[in-house]
Structures are given as structure tokens and as C-alpha cells.
Amino acid sequence: IIWSYNWGGRSDKNFARKHEYAWCYSKGDKFLFNSDDVRVERKVSKNLRTGKNYTKGTVPTCVWEKNNHTTSKDYCGWHATTKNLEILQRIIKAYTNENDLVLDCFMGSGSTAIACKQTNRDYIGCELDTDYITKARKRVKSYDRINTLSEFL
């Protein structure tokens, strides 16, 4: 999946690189794909030839455009490539069911862990940088507190 965006700096020496790749792997030859969980609204809601209405939406292409993070809380300023939570949630919903296990081999700021919590998945995160590990743990725990508090509001 390619996440395309149009924010951040520009270069005068080459085209601006305004995309990130998301690699999705699965154990074994068969993989799960929950197409109904990732459908998006169609630009055309009716087949002009048959008159059939498209009510379910359509499965998106492998290039997803999302120009910024949902909220400033979703973006952490200490990691250069914080991923968008909506993008991660869509990927996680597409390839896993609730209570499945997601492995993030490059945990960074912990965005995948947060998206897993928000979609009721378990996760394992791996990271080499001990500073990132400490900060990611704190960031993931802060989402736990927010969710717990919102249950009482």
C-alpha cells in the first residue's frame, strides 16, 4: 500500500517524495482480506448501463491519499515518520480480525500499537532505538488513559 500525502518540505533539486510504503505480510500461503471493512464511497453510485445501485462502496486501490494526521495528538513531533492512525486502522482491519495478533517490526513512535488497540487487535512491537521504545510506551499508555476516561464521560 502506498500512502500519498502533500505536506512537508519541498526540494528544488528533484521531485518531492510525498509517499510512504506499508508492507503487509501474512503467515502461510493464504491471507485474510476483509474487503467490507475497508470499502470507500464510490464516485458513481449507479451503473448507468444496468441501473444497478452501488450501495456497498468500492474496495480502494493500493494508493491511499491522506494529506495529514487526524489530530495533532496523532502526530508526535519526536519521530520523523509518524504514521497516520486512520491509514493504519484501515490496513489492520483489511488483513486481520478482532483479537488477531499484529507484528510491527519497526515500531518507531507506536502508531501501529495504538491503531491495534483502537481496532481490538493484539500487537507485538519491535524497535532498536531505546529512546523510541521509552517514548512509544509512554505514547501508547497515554491512549489507554484517554480511552478509559472517555468511557466515563
What are these language model-derived features?
Residues 1-135:
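Core catalytic lobe of class I
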